[in-house]
C-alpha cells in the first residue's frame, strides 16, 4: 500500500473519497459493476506480526476453514487495515457475535411464539362460534380477521431474522469505515493545528521583539501569548477526540479498549473506478441488494391477510424507491468528493510553488521567519485539506 505522505494531493479529501467509493458494505450496495497516536508510524509492508495477536484468536467465531491460513494470520495480527474491516466486524464485533450466536441457537426452533398464540386464539374462536347464530358467526369472522392480521405481522422466519442481522452487520462495517477515515483525518488535523501553533509562536516572538523596540505594547504581547495558549488547548482537545475514535475502533473490532493496533492508511481513491461508475446500469443490482427490499419481499411469502399483503407491497415499493434515491445520492457524493480532490490538487500545487519560493528567499535573508511560517502554514493546510 502506498504511503499517504507520498501523495501529491490533499490527504483529507483523498481519504474521504476513498472511503466513499469503497463503501460497498453499506446497507445499500451502491455500485455493482465494478493508544495515543496522532503521529502514526509508517511500517514497511513486510511488518512483523505481534507476539500477542489482537484481536484475541480465542474469540474467533467462524471455523478454521472459513478463511485461508494467510487470511487468518492477517486478521489475527496487530495491524488494522481498511480492507480487513468487513471480516474483522464479522469475527470480532460484540454485536455481530451476539447476533450470530442468537441466530445459531434459534435456527430451527420455534421463533414465533406470539404467532402461535394468535393462531391458538383463532382456533378457539372458531371452536366456540355458533354457526347457526348469524351475529355470533359474523363477530367470530371479524375477530378472526383481526387476529390473523396480528399473527401475520408478528410472524418472522429465520431468513427474515438473518436479513436483519446482516443489515446490522453491514451498518457496523460502514461505521468502522467512517471511524477509520475520521481517525486518519485526525492526524492531518493535528498537523494543521501544530503548524498553526508554530505560526502563533512566531507571531508571539515577533510581537515580543517589537515590544522591546518600543513598537508594541504589553497588551499586544499578552494577546499573542493567549493565542498560543488557546491553540495548545485546541491541540489537547483534538488529541482527546482522536483517542476516543481510536478506542471505538478497538472495541468494535475485537481489540481491548487500551489496545494499540498499528493502524494503516486508508487506501488511495481509485479514480478509474469512479470514472466507470454508472448508477443507471447498477440500479437493478443495488435495489436487489437492499436489505429492506429483501426483508419485505421475504415477508410477502408469509402473509395471508390481503390487507397486509397490499400494505407489504407498498413497503416493498417504498424501499425500492428509497434504494434508487440513495444510489443516486451516493453517486453524487462521489462526484462531489472527486471535485473536492481536484480542487485540493490545484491548491496544493500553488502552495508548493509558494513554499519553494519562500524557502529560497528565507535562505538568503529576503523574508523574515514569521513570513516563512505563514507560507509554511498555508502549505501544510493545503496538503492536509
Each model region followed by its residue ranges:
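Sec-dependent N-terminal signal peptides of Gram-positive bacterial secreted proteins and lipoproteins
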Residues: 2-32
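Short flexible linkers and secondary-structure junctions
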Residues: 3, 10, 31-178
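Long, non-membrane, amphipathic alpha-helices that form coiled-coils
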Residues: 82, 158-161, 165, 169, ...
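Charged, solvent-exposed structural "stalk/scaffold" segments
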Residues: 99, 150, 188-237, 339-385
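Coiled-coil heptad-register positions
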Residues: 100, 107, 114, 121, ...
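Short, solvent-exposed, mixed-charge loop/turn linkers that connect secondary-structure elements
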Residues: 239-282, 293
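Extended amphipathic alpha-helical heptad-repeat regions
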Residues: 283, 292, 324, 371-372
Amino acid at each position: 500500500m502506498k504511503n499517504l505522505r507520498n501523495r501529491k494531493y490533499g490527504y483529507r479529501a483523498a481519504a474521504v473519497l476513498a472511503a466513499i467509493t469503497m463503501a460497498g458494505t453499506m446497507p445499500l450496495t451502491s455500485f455493482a459493476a465494478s493508544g495515543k497516536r496522532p503521529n502514526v508510524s509508517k511500517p514497511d509492508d513486510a511488518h512483523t506480526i505481534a507476539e500477542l495477536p489482537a484481536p484475541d484468536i480465542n474469540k474467533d467465531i467462524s471455523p478454521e476453514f472459513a478463511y485461508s491460513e494467510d487470511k487468518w494470520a492477517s486478521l489475527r495480527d496487530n495491524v488494522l487495515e481498511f480492507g480487513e474491516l468487513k471480516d474483522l466486524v464479522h469475527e470480532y464485533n460484540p454485536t455481530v457475535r451476539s447476533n450470530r450466536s442468537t441466530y445459531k441457537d434459534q435456527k430451527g426452533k420455534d421463533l414465533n411464539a406470539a404467532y402461535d398464540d394468535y393462531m391458538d386464539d383463532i382456533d378457539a374462536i372458531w371452536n366456540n362460534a355458533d354457526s347457526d347464530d348469524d351475529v355470533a358467526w359474523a363477530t367470530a369472522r371479524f375477530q378472526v380477521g383481526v387476529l390473523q392480521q396480528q399473527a401475520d405481522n408478528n410472524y418472522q422466519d429465520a431468513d427474515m431474522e438473518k436479513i436483519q442481522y446482516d443489515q446490522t452487520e453491514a451498518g457496523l462495517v460502514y461505521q468502522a469505515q467512517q471511524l477509520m477515515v475520521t481517525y486518519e483525518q485526525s492526524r492531518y488535523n493535528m498537523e494543521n493545528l501544530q503548524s498553526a501553533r508554530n505560526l502563533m509562536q512566531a507571531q508571539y516572538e515577533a510581537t515580543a521583539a517589537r515590544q522591546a523596540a518600543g513598537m508594541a505594547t504589553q497588551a499586544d504581547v499578552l494577546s499573542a501569548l493567549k493565542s498560543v495558549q488557546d491553540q495548545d488547548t485546541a491541540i489537547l482537545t483534538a488529541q482527546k477526540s482522536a483517542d476516543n475514535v481510536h478506542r471505538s475502533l478497538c472495541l468494535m473490532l475485537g481489540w481491548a479498549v487500551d489496545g494499540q493496533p498499528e493502524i494503516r492508511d486508508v487506501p488511495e481513491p481509485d479514480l478509474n473506478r469512479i470514472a466507470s461508475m454508472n448508477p443507471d446500469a447498477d440500479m437493478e443490482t443495488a435495489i436487489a441488494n437492499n436489505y429492506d427490499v429483501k426483508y419485505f419481499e421475504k415477508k410477502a411469502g408469509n402473509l395471508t391477510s390481503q390487507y397486509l399483503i397490499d400494505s407489504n407491497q407498498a413497503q416493498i415499493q417504498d424501499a425500492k424507491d428509497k434504494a434508487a434515491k440513495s444510489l443516486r445520492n451516493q453517486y453524487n457524493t462521489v462526484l462531489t468528493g472527486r471535485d473536492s480532490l481536484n480542487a485540493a490538487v490545484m491548491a496544493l500545487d500553488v502552495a508548493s510553488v509558494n513554499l519553494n519560493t519562500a524557502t529560497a528567499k528565507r535562505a538568503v535573508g529576503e523574508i523574515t521567519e514569521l513570513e516563512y511560517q505563514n507560507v509554511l502554514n498555508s502549505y501544510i493546510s493545503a496538503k492536509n485539506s
